[in-house]
Amino acid sequence: MAIKKYKPTTNGRRNMTSIDYKATLTTSTPEKSLLAAKNSKAGRNNRGLITTRHKGGGHKQKYRIIDFKRNKRDVVGTIATIEYDPNRNAFICLVNYLDGEKRYILFAKGMTVGMKIVASEHADIKVGNAAPLKNIPEGTLIHNVELKPGKGGQMARSAGTSVQILGKDDDGKYVTLRLTSGEVRKVLADCYATIGEVGNEEYNLVNWGKAGRNRWRGIRPTVRGSVMNPNDHPHGGGEGRTPIGRKSPVTPWGKKALGVKTRNTKKPSEKLIVRKRNAKK
């Protein structure tokens, strides 16, 4: 991977960077049979009310159907292409299986066109192969990790992320993992995961350069509450630049914004977390 820098021909181009896609991607034409329509909701629900702020606009996109379950077992596949996916910051690979089926999977660091991969109970510990956590050695970096067997990968799917296997329980029921965030948690040993780290690891180094590039991505401006009217935000109103008039900042709906823990401690998975991501080391 490489970061592409631009000459400061305009103010928007100054300090702008982007991913050098030509260095990794092999085609710009997606597989038609694995495309689906994607309608932009602009952050609205079925009643037209904003449920997620700062969303709307952006370039028209088609959804790529990704195989997160890796449930095509014991059938060898060949990586045909490495492609761009507008719906995620990771790249994707088109896999041609021996029985003729085609599927998209996440691109892992080290994958190349022509590489053979397989999802199997006792697959080799090789980048791109998928296997149950109980059969993957300790210390291995993995991605696309399931939380429930058969549900499909839910953890470590973003560009540059990975999960490390720290250990296994004596009874063989759970495997202990360390996530990118620093959290240490247990996952059922029968859950599948894919070997390797997700590619496009330099994505977080991209400098978008100008507001327009974020608008192309469907991200709208974030406006401070203190410059709104009082009917739009609790911080709004007043003549000129005035304090918020409260002991502590609040959300647009009046709830405290700082120092409040947002995780529900009554979730059943709470007992599986060995160490919190924000625990003092």
From Swiss-Prot:
<dbReference type="GO" id="GO:0016740">
    <property type="term" value="F:transferase activity"/>
</dbReference>
<dbReference type="InterPro" id="IPR008991">
    <property type="entry name" value="Translation_prot_SH3-like_sf"/>
</dbReference>
<feature type="region of interest" description="Disordered">
    <location>
        <begin position="222"/>
        <end position="281"/>
    </location>
</feature>
<dbReference type="InterPro" id="IPR005880">
    <property type="entry name" value="Ribosomal_uL2_bac/org-type"/>
</dbReference>
<dbReference type="InterPro" id="IPR022666">
    <property type="entry name" value="Ribosomal_uL2_RNA-bd_dom"/>
</dbReference>
<dbReference type="Pfam" id="PF00181">
    <property type="entry name" value="Ribosomal_L2"/>
</dbReference>
<keyword id="KW-0687">Ribonucleoprotein</keyword>
<protein>
    <recommendedName>
        <fullName>Large ribosomal subunit protein uL2</fullName>
    </recommendedName>
</protein>
<dbReference type="GO" id="GO:0019843">
    <property type="term" value="F:rRNA binding"/>
</dbReference>
<comment type="similarity">
    <text>Belongs to the universal ribosomal protein uL2 family.</text>
</comment>
<keyword id="KW-0694">RNA-binding</keyword>
<keyword id="KW-0689">Ribosomal protein</keyword>
<dbReference type="InterPro" id="IPR022669">
    <property type="entry name" value="Ribosomal_uL2_C"/>
</dbReference>
<comment type="function">
    <text>One of the primary rRNA binding proteins. Required for association of the 30S and 50S subunits to form the 70S ribosome, for tRNA binding and peptide bond formation. It has been suggested to have peptidyltransferase activity; this is somewhat controversial. Makes several contacts with the 16S rRNA in the 70S ribosome.</text>
</comment>
<dbReference type="InterPro" id="IPR002171">
    <property type="entry name" value="Ribosomal_uL2"/>
</dbReference>
<dbReference type="InterPro" id="IPR014722">
    <property type="entry name" value="Rib_uL2_dom2"/>
</dbReference>
<dbReference type="Pfam" id="PF03947">
    <property type="entry name" value="Ribosomal_L2_C"/>
</dbReference>
<dbReference type="GO" id="GO:0003735">
    <property type="term" value="F:structural constituent of ribosome"/>
</dbReference>
<dbReference type="InterPro" id="IPR014726">
    <property type="entry name" value="Ribosomal_uL2_dom3"/>
</dbReference>
<keyword id="KW-0699">rRNA-binding</keyword>
<dbReference type="InterPro" id="IPR022671">
    <property type="entry name" value="Ribosomal_uL2_CS"/>
</dbReference>
<dbReference type="GO" id="GO:0015934">
    <property type="term" value="C:large ribosomal subunit"/>
</dbReference>
<dbReference type="GO" id="GO:0002181">
    <property type="term" value="P:cytoplasmic translation"/>
</dbReference>
<dbReference type="InterPro" id="IPR012340">
    <property type="entry name" value="NA-bd_OB-fold"/>
</dbReference>
<comment type="subunit">
    <text>Part of the 50S ribosomal subunit. Forms a bridge to the 30S subunit in the 70S ribosome.</text>
</comment>
